[in-house]
Amino acid sequence: MTPDEYCQQKAARSGSSFYYSFLFLPPRKRRAIIAVYAFCREVDDIVDEVSDASVARTKLAWWRREVAQAFGGAPQHPVAHALQPVVAQFVLREADFQTIIDGMAMDLEQSRFLDFPALELYCHRVAGVVGLISAEILGYVDPSTRGYARDLGIAFQLTNIIRDVGEDARRGRIYLPQDDLDRFGIASSAILRGEYSDAFRALMTFEVERAQQWYDRALAQLPDADRRAQRAGLIMAAIYRALLSEIARDGFLVLDRRTSLTPLRKLWLAWKT
């Protein structure tokens, strides 16, 4: 299996939202985006799948060295091999990849967030920076597109958090800010137990509205001159916003299930965006 094939298998499963967003990209940019997302999956899987925090820290430290090698050395991992020509072709920054690892490391140090600014920092590191990297690969002529890309990444992460409340709770994690829970009178223990209530639905209504506001904020920053180049992000936004609407339509049943869109609907959204 070549490094590119490994990345394809890791990051872009047929039917995933990401799969539909890159369908229309030229091959060179598609390979680059897939390599970046495969890297994100590798480091995210360490946090999600390695139960011993000290082992996870060691693995993340190894990836820090692999990133450095991808920018000027002899990397060992197939994802780092795939990244090596990408970072040169698109003049990407090593610091951005290290920041993504910083974000993943936050999951090893904390399982709660006091307020939204704390959560925004986490989202910036694990997703906003991914948006910035993606913008460089997709291309832009107006620097304000970077603001769009960063905020869109945060919107994507907020959507993931909403979709995965129950799944994260079963891992002992609550990403919804503690002051949001306090505002709606919900104890952390109720989330961990998977208890639905009117207060929980009110909380989730608030969280979905905030995520939608981040999409609005991102899209307002995208200049017309860069809309075509940034189409992959717009496709992802259309799919993820539809997912938020579906979650709300289902009554915010995110504690015991994972809402998703059908492949046909994703394809239709991608085609019309």
Task: Enumerate the predicted regions with their spans.
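Catalytic cores of Mg2+-dependent Asp-rich isoprenoid enzymes
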Residues: 1-157, 162, 166-273
